[in-house]
């Protein structure tokens, strides 16, 4: 990115990539809202007056994104901006007008939104979000009940116990769970019989959760066999040797943490997005992203009073005496998901439902990449979550956002407001 942005113009002539590719219509690159036009030469000439140094701001993903946002603010204020006064000798008044553009990946989007929208930090000119789990990701439920898959399990946990011991005590990780706004509050956790039909509760309502748009009480705090931390996994909520002396039990601490997650989600949703926000995300039906979490099997033995619950911590309940107990399987529902199919697929981590949330919230532009996207660039498969910025479509969308945001900059001497 830095190399591309530092070579926009030479002798007032656009360099090859900018002239050949950057000027194409956003719709060709998967832009789905139709509110923005192509970059023009004047915009590129203005952008070329600025220096685009790329600074990497890390954060602790275990702590709340609210706190991580403050850490990023301190990094900008104490390291990034002072650098240009100390090392480049810029005038203090000019430095005081300088702002940054945030380019985020995944969870970093939540950090950036907390920074600008919750803390009101004003030295951000605009934001480019990449593959942000904007309203959460149901993948976290799968990981806490089954462990991670593939090579990731070596580091992040191979079963429910290993994952729960860390994630259930980590605000930042739990803030990745689906919020009340995920899929507009509609169900994403389904209890089905062996034939794939959604079961009914004693009131005749489908056992599809959340039933009442409250995943915090219905799923995350629930100690039932299908809860995020069922009773048999409560032992992993506190792995220390001091449990006996604690005044408040591990389950109580966990529920307090869930309450703080709900508060964070609610405040972030109400605060919206920075006024200059551009987003891109993967939306490919071949990238299974655990959109529907389905427990398939007969739960009757698990719901019998006094029953001893046992599961293999990889998503399957077991018993010496009963077969066909619930196991987690991939969606979609065999009986047909009554929900809109527009949110299916994703990038193997963030479901389309969550990736498309910024567009639904009305950000400046949103690029949908993969089989569910449109435009000439979407003739190939959508990208995988971790590798997103290695894809030319994500790179194009990010550069487009940066150039558009730069039009608001005013601290160069040749720009309005400059010195």
Regions found by a protein language model. Name each.
Residues 1-103, 107-161, 184-187, 191-192, ...:
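N-terminal non-catalytic accessory region
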Residues 5, 12, 33-39, 69-91, ...:
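A Trp-anchored, charged/polar loop motif used as the substrate-binding/catalytic surface
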Residues 25-26, 38, 82, 92, ...:
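Proline-rich intrinsically disordered, low-complexity coils
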Residues 142-145, 166-177, 319-327:
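Noncatalytic linker/hinge segments flanking ATPase motor cores
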Residues 152-245, 257-265:
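Alpha/beta-hydrolase-fold enzymes
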Residues 220, 228-419:
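C-terminal subdomain of alpha/beta-hydrolase-fold enzymes, centered on the catalytic histidine
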């Amino acid at each position: 990115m830095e190399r591309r942005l530092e070579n926009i113009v030479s002798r007032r002539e656009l360099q090859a990539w900018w002239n050949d590719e950057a000027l194409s219509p956003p719709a060709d690159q998967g832009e789905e809202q139709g509110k923005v036009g192509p970059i023009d030469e004047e915009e590129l000439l203005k952008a070329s007056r600025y220096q685009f140094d790329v600074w990497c701001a890390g954060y602790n993903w275990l702590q709340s994104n609210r706190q991580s946002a403050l850490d990023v603010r301190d990094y900008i204020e104490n390291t990034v901006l002072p650098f240009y006064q100390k090392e480049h000798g810029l005038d203090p008044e000019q430095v005081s007008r300088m702002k940054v553009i945030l380019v985020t990946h995944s969870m970093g989007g939540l950090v950036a939104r907390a920074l600008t929208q919750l803390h009101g930090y004003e030295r951000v000119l605009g934001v480019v979000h990449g593959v942000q789990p904007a309203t959460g990701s149901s993948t976290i439920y799968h990981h806490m009940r089954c462990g991670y898959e593939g090579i990731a399990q070596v580091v992040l946990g191979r079963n429910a116990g290993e994952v729960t011991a860390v994630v259930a005590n980590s605000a930042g990780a739990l803030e990745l769970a689906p919020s009340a706004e995920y899929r507009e509050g509609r169900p994403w956790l389904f209890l089905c019989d062996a034939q794939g039909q959604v079961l009914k509760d004693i009131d005749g309502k489908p056992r599809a959760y959340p039933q009442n748009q409250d995943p915090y009480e219905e799923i995350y705090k629930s100690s039932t066999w299908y809860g995020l931390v069922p009773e048999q996994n409560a032992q992993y909520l506190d792995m220390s040797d001091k449990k006996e002396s604690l005044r408040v039990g591990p389950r109580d601490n966990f529920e307090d943490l869930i309450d703080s997650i709900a508060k964070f989600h609610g405040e972030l949703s109400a605060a919206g997005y920075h006024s200059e926000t551009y987003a891109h995300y993967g939306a490919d039906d071949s990238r299974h992203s655990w959109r529907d979490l389905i427990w398939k099997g007969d739960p009757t033995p698990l719901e019998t009073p006094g029953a001893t619950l046992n599961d293999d911590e990889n998503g399957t309940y077991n018993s010496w005496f009963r077969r066909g107990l619930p196991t987690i399987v991939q969606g979609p529902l065999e009986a047909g998901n009554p929900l809109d199919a527009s949110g299916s697929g994703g990038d193997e981590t963030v479901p389309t439902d969550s990736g498309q949330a910024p567009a639904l919230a009305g950000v400046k532009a949103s690029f949908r990449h993969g089989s569910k996207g449109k435009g000439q660039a979407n003739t190939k498969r959508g990208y995988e979550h971790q590798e997103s910025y290695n894809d030319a479509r994500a790179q194009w969308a990010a550069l487009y956002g940066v150039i558009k945001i730069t039009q608001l900059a005013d601290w160069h001497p040749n720009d309005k407001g400059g010195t």
